[in-house]
Amino acid sequence: MNLALFDLDHTLLSGDSDFEWAQFLIEQGVLDREVYEARNQTFFDQYKNGTLDIREFLAFQLKPLSRHPRRVLDGWHHQFMQKKILPILRPRARELVERHRGDLCAIVTATNSFVTAPIAREFGIDHLIATEPAHAGGEFTGEVTGTPCFREGKFTRLVDWLALRGVSLASFAQSWFYSDSLNDLPLLSRVTHPVAVDPDDTLRAHAEKHHWQIISLQ
């Protein structure tokens, strides 16, 4: 069996699921637009530049989850999927995932699993490696549990996940990772088939230098 790994935001989706979740909450009147959008833009700029402090960002990202009961969040998420995610789900991304049926497939994303688990199911991908929000008594605490699934943390989390299955990356004759971002270089550099998907300029330059495949799902 081969291994196929997919980044989510700006790879399988034409947008960012965490950003869209925040926009949804703003539209629900849950978050203050002016305050939240200014901070979110700062974090996004840092992400693009490869300078994001993931712990600082996650404290910001996960705080809204701790303010509302899980049953309310789940209800909002159903609306969020219909309103925000389905419109940015790339048809060509569905086709790409279908081409890997029969491989061991997983989405590997820095965005938290509350936001992304239903999206993985929408793609028909059974396995999700994501940043895990901590919870107590069934409710989110606003904290993170385990290693954030970001930069080198994506590779760390993948190694741990494979170990639970009794295998390692070397167990697969072929492995793919599809991503748009320079932040994913630590994992891209470790698979046999790194694929840059509609990449940012830095990743495109790296991919061209190392003769990696570059594709578009737009």
Stretches with model-predicted labels:
Residues 1, 75, 82-218:
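C-terminal cap/substrate-recognition subdomain and adjoining C-terminal extension
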